[in-house]
């Protein structure tokens, strides 16, 4: 840490009125590019317009201008998010059975969408209980609203209006910070100040205010709701905030105010800041008092973290110093030069952020079911399945995006002349070793993971169950995973003496938690079947990484095309006369990586869906006997590929296939339509450009004959455009098919 004298002068960090506001300019399509602004000559123009509209690098090479555009666009994004949130809350206020659900969350299912009877589609309004007819929703909003203490639809209305106001404010901010007071480049590059403000402000004060809301509003309201008090009788949020006696009736230590805090007698607050672990048996969610305690602790950590970096006061850490001091015995210059990369290349910065956020999103997916945070979430199986699936897909897309922007950084922003012997240079210099080893790992994992299944299918087909890998024949128990489970299950009596129960029921040990006769959570047993499918996970993840990492490491050059950097991020082939050089651009690696990401995530969500229905979700009778949805068939059925096809895909597709004529019929139509969208993608992926150009010229001839030829000359999609359209429909079709399949199934049986 270096201590310097404070800097005397205050820097002016904005430019006033840098860009005039012009509706005329915005109304001209392609105004950001000289070529596009001329208007269309061929139909390729509209595709280029879409490809380049947000590629700010192609509009200008001025880093300050690019930074301002990105900054301004972020406000636009936030505006759309507020608008979307407002819509969610408005539906909750206007079209939902929220108040009915609040009074009986175990028997009434959440609905916030009512179909209007225009052409007879009111069949979609199913009976969700309590005399309400609508579409069952699986977003988890009702559970979040209850956890935050919302007790009436009027409160939802007010929040929806508030979100609209914020959406307008964000739109204004986006305009203001580009056209009226635009930050200078130095402001965008002041990482220490940015870290301090984001850590202390967004994460620190954000968590603190949420903890405050939970203690003063959520906890008392949920206390009343759990006790069965009618939501209309519960005092309103402002009454709890203004009247301390109300809170003191529920939590006596509130009568003492802040005295225990300042006298360091903090244990007084243990009534509402707890450390219990496990789930609340009434709601099947984490203890809300644990959650409040967690947010208070997080707030303290981030408030401290937000005061660690050196800004105007000459005290604290400098990021450049930290990075340059980071050298290991095998890393040459280490992190030297990374500071310059990350402050001048937003692609490099974005790649890191996407990789971390994508990984974090996948971690969230796994926590949402193993530590369900909201009341009555764990017993809403449709919502549990939707939240897991949603966060897995999002995480997958973000990680592929990380590779895409890392490759764009390599092509556009990497300067080989200034990088020597730092970490990145060393990785690039032994990229052949990295990729060939990774390739070997993929081959090993692929043959061995599928080999285990093929062995089982063969033995099963030949009627030799005693020779299969299964829990009842040749066992392949996941011993390391079971050891980890056991360690965590025993933690409260060993490594975490302060906790009453382990962090998650899934570890084992404790009994189950059931709410209203439905299982919320219980210890999840792992066996041979999980061992097999986990190696498929390892295989698909490694192949995805192989494709993406090869795209990044060979983005600038390869033995095949040494001057790849000059060809750009996306190009079809290395020009005429060089056969075998197609599909080598960094863009093509992202394109291929998307398919493997889709493979990887599909296996994960299939595994989760079946495992939970087989071993966790189900009903419990008065004697305490649990009946699982698919009766524990995962362990014996999922050990063959035939079992996956027969007992998962086919058996569980019966609900979506037989949904016609019921309130689930929309899922049947989506299932069909999404299959069609997926199949449509193959037309783009399997066909060559010349085929379409010939067909188009034939059609243009016919138009000319009839004197109806358009002024804009029709062109076949370029190779890259065709692939982009193909992969988009492939993913959209595949994801929507899975969505319809999962929801029709789980809403029918859950």
Curated annotation (Swiss-Prot):
Annotated chlorophyll a binding sites: 683, 691
Cell location: Plastid, Chloroplast thylakoid membrane
Predominant location: plastid
TM stretches of this protein: 70-93, 156-179, 195-219, 291-309, 346-369, 385-411, 433-455, 531-549, 589-610, 664-686, 724-744
Catalyzed chemical reaction(s): reduced [plastocyanin] + hnu + oxidized [2Fe-2S]-[ferredoxin] = oxidized [plastocyanin] + reduced [2Fe-2S]-[ferredoxin]
Binding site for phylloquinone: 692
UniProt enzyme class: oxidoreductase
Keyword set includes Disulfide bond: no
Topological category with respect to the lipid bilayer: Multi-pass membrane protein
Gene Ontology terms, MF aspect: 4 iron, 4 sulfur cluster binding; chlorophyll binding; electron transfer activity; magnesium ion binding; oxidoreductase activity
GO cellular component: a single term: chloroplast thylakoid membrane
GO BP of this protein: photosynthesis
Binding-site list for chlorophyll a': 675
EC number of this enzyme: 1.97.1.12
Family designation: Belongs to the PsaA/PsaB family.
Name this protein carries in UniProt: Photosystem I P700 chlorophyll a apoprotein A1
Species per Swiss-Prot/TrEMBL record: Nandina domestica
Phylogenetic placement of the source organism: Eukaryota, Viridiplantae, Streptophyta, Embryophyta, Tracheophyta
């Amino acid at each position: 840490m270096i201590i310097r004298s404070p800097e005397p002068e205050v820097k002016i960090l904005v430019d006033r009125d840098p860009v005039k506001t012009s509706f005329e300019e915005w109304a001209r399509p392609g105004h950001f590019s000289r070529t596009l602004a001329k208007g269309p000559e061929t139909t390729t123009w509209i595709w280029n317009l879409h490809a380049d509209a947000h590629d700010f690098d192609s509009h200008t090479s001025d880093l300050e201008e690019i930074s301002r555009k990105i900054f301004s666009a972020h406000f636009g994004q936030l505006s759309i998010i507020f608008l979307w949130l407002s819509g969610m809350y408005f539906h909750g206020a206007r079209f939902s059975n929220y108040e009915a659900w609040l009074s009986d969350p175990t028997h009434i299912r959440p609905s916030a969408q009512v179909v209007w009877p225009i052409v007879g589609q009111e069949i979609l309004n199913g009976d969700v209980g309590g005399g309400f007819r609508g579409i069952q929703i699986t977003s988890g909003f009702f559970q979040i609203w209850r956890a935050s203490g919302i007790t009436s639809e009027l409160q939802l209305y007010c929040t929806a209006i508030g979100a609209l106001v914020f959406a307008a404010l964000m739109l204004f901010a986006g305009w203001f910070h580009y056209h009226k007071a635009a930050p200078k480049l130095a402001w965008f590059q002041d990482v220490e100040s940015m870290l301090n403000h984001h850590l202390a402000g967004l994460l620190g004060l954000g968590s603190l205010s949420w903890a405050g809301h939970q203690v003063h509003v959520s906890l008392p309201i949920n206390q009343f709701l759990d006790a069965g008090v009618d939501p209309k009788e519960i005092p309103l949020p402002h009454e709890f905030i203004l009247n301390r006696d109300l809170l003191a009736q529920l939590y006596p230590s509130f009568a003492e105010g802040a005295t225990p805090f300042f006298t360091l007698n903090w244990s007084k607050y243990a009534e509402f800041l707890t450390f219990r672990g496990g789930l609340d048996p009434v709601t099947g969610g984490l203890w809300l008092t644990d959650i409040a305690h967690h947010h208070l602790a997080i707030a303290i950590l981030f408030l401290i973290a937000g005061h660690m970096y050196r800004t105007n006061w000459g005290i604290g850490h400098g990021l450049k110093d930290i990075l340059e001091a980071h050298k290991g015995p095998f890393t040459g210059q280490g992190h030297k030069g990374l500071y310059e990369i990350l402050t001048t290349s937003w692609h490099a910065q974005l790649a890191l952020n996407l990789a971390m956020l994508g990984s974090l999103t996948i971690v969230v997916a796994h926590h949402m079911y193993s530590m369900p945070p909201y009341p009555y979430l764990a017993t809403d199986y449709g919502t549990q399945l939707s939240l897991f699936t949603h966060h897995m897909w999002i995480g997958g897309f973000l990680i592929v995006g990380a590779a895409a922007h890392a490759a764009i950084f390599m092509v556009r922003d990497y300067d080989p002349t200034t990088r020597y012997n730092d970490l990145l240079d060393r990785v690039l210099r032994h990229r052949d070793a990295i990729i060939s080893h990774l390739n070997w790992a993929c081959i090993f994992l692929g043959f061995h993971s599928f080999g285990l299944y093929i062995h089982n299918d063969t033995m099963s087909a030949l009627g030799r169950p005693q020779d299969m890998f299964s829990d009842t024949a040749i066992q392949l128990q996941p011993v390391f995973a079971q050891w980890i489970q056991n360690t965590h299950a025993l933690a409260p009596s060993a490594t975490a003496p302060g906790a009453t129960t382990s962090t998650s029921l899934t570890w084992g040990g404790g009994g189950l938690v059931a709410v209203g006769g439905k299982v919320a959570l219980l210890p999840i047993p792992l066996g041979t079947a999980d061992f097999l499918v986990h190696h498929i996970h390892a295989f698909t993840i490694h192949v995805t990484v192989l494709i993406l990492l090869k795209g990044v490491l060979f983005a600038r050059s390869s033995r095949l095309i040494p001057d790849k950097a000059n060809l750009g991020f996306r190009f079809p082939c290395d020009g005429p006369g060089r056969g075998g050089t197609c599909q080598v651009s960094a863009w093509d690696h992202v394109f291929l990586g998307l398919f493997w990401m889709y493979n990887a995530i599909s296996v994960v969500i299939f595994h989760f869906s079946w495992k939970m229905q087989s071993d966790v979700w189900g009903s419990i009778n008065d004697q305490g006997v649990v009946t699982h949805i698919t009766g524990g068939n995962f362990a014996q059925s999922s050990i063959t590929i035939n079992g996956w096809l027969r007992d998962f895909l086919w058996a569980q597709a019966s609900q979506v296939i037989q949904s016609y004529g019921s309130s689930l019929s929309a899922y049947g139509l989506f299932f069909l339509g999404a299959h069609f969208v997926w199949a449509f993608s193959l037309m783009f992926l399997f066909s060559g450009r010349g085929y379409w150009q010939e067909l188009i010229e034939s059609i243009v001839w016919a138009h000319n004959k009839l004197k109806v030829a358009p002024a804009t000359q029709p062109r076949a999609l370029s190779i890259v455009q065709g692939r982009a359209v193909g992969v988009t429909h492939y993913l959209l079709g595949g994801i929507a098919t899975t969505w319809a399949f999962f929801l029709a199934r789980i809403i029918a049986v859950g």
